[in-house]
């Protein structure tokens, strides 16, 4: 199956600890955790968002 390697993850704001975004990533090709600058609607500014596992 084509999407068997993809894992659902959440992107959590480093400042307010809210999970603002969800996405998928290929766990075989991207082994390190994602860290992106994204917009946080609670703080109304761009902050660093780090990858967390979703239940």
UniProtKB/Swiss-Prot annotation:
Highest rank taxon of the organism: Bacteria
MF-aspect GO terms: structural constituent of ribosome
PROSITE patterns recorded: RIBOSOMAL_L33 (PS00582)
InterPro entries: Ribosomal_bL33, Ribosomal_bL33_CS, Ribosomal_bL33_sf, Ribosomal_zn-bd
Record carries keyword Ribosomal protein: yes
Keywords, comma-separated and alphabetical: Ribonucleoprotein, Ribosomal protein
Single biological process term from Gene Ontology: translation
Lineage: Bacteria, Pseudomonadati, Campylobacterota, Epsilonproteobacteria, Campylobacterales
PANTHER family per UniProt: 50S RIBOSOMAL PROTEIN L33, CHLOROPLASTIC, LARGE RIBOSOMAL SUBUNIT PROTEIN BL33A
Any Gene Ontology CC annotation: ribosome
Protein family per UniProt: Belongs to the bacterial ribosomal protein bL33 family.
Protein name: Large ribosomal subunit protein bL33
Species annotation: Campylobacter fetus subsp. fetus (strain 82-40)
NCBIfam families (alphabetical): PRK00504.1, PRK00595.1, rpmG_bact
């Amino acid at each position: 199956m084509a999407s068997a390697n993809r894992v659902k993850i959440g992107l959590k704001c480093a400042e307010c600890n809210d999970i603002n975004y969800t996405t998928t990533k290929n766990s075989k090709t991207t082994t390190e955790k994602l860290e992106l600058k994204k917009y946080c609607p609670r703080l109304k500014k761009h902050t660093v968002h780090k990858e967390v596992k979703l239940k």
